[in-house]
Structure formats: structure tokens, C-alpha cells
């Protein structure tokens, strides 16, 4: 089945009962299938607007998982995040920047993940959500598989 919820709660609900591949920009997912049929196991989170945002929260910036590299390049971030914008401008081609997502770059676990070094240097943390709880994890621990 192909699911495309418009809110995070519905997406988390579906993940509780089905084993699904999570998709958004698909810049890694589609090439990884090597033209194989993906089957009926896709959760497309690209329609969840709350995941495609850049928000100011107390003393940090919250960048949603489906935020694209182009979104970051065009955003009005403080000067201390200029490095992130410059790194975003170096990710792949313009086509990848327009569809590739921050969350996909981190979750794919590729050794060539363009965004990881910059986000690590900014001491980034990630938010992991399930129906039961929300965890905040330092990116360095997430990368290690902690």
C-alpha cells in the first residue's frame, strides 16, 4: 500500500501497524531499488507540512526532516548558520538540492552524506518520534547507531 498522510500523527499510526519504507525526496530510495518494483510498502511523508519547515525555537533552529537543501539555501538564517547554507549549496546538483531532504540525508546512513559533517560541526541534535514517545538525540550518537 502507498500511504501519504498529511500529518505526523497519522504517519506514526501507520508505522505502528505496517512495515514501510519512508520516502520524501526519494533521491536515494529510487536509485537504490535498481529499477525493482517498490511494492506496496511506502509511507510518503512529503505531504506533512510540519516536517518541511525552519523554525526558531528558544536557543536553536528546528529544521524539519523534509526540508530540502534548496529550502535551506533560500532561508533567512542568522550568520552563525551561513556554513550550513554554503554546505547545502554544495550538495549534489540543483535537482538533488530541490528534492533531496535533510532527514533523508541523515537516515540513509551513506558514508557520502553531504549534510552530516556540517551538521556535526554545528552540534546538531535530532528528534525521533514514535506513537509512544519523542527522543532527542545528538547527531553524533545517531550516526553511531546509539
Roles of regions detected by a PLM:
Residues 1-146:
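C-terminal structural segment of proteins
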Amino acid at each position: 500500500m502507498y500511504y501519504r498522510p498529511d500529518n505526523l500523527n497519522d504517519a506514526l499510526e501507520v508505522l505502528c501497524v505496517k512495515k514501510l519504507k519512508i520516502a520524501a525526496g526519494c533521491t536515494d530510495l529510487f536509485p537504490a531499488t535498481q529499477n525493482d518494483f517498490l511494492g506496496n510498502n511506502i509511507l510518503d511523508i512529503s505531504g506533512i507540512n510540519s516536517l518541511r519547515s525552519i523554525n526558531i525555537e528558544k536557543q536553536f533552529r528546528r529544521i524539519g526532516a523534509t526540508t530540502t537543501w534548496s529550502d535551506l539555501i533560500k532561508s533567512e538564517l542568522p550568520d552563525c548558520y551561513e556554513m550550513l547554507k554554503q554546505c547545502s549549496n554544495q550538495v549534489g546538483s540543483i535537482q538533488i538540492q530541490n528534492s533531496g531532504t535533510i532527514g533523508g540525508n541523515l537516515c540513509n546512513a551513506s558514508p557520502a552524506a553531504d549534510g552530516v559533517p556540517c551538521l556535526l560541526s554545528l552540534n546538531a541534535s535530532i528528534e525521533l518520534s514514535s506513537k509512544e514517545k519523542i527522543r532527542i538525540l545528538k547527531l553524533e550518537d545517531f550516526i553511531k547507531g546509539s
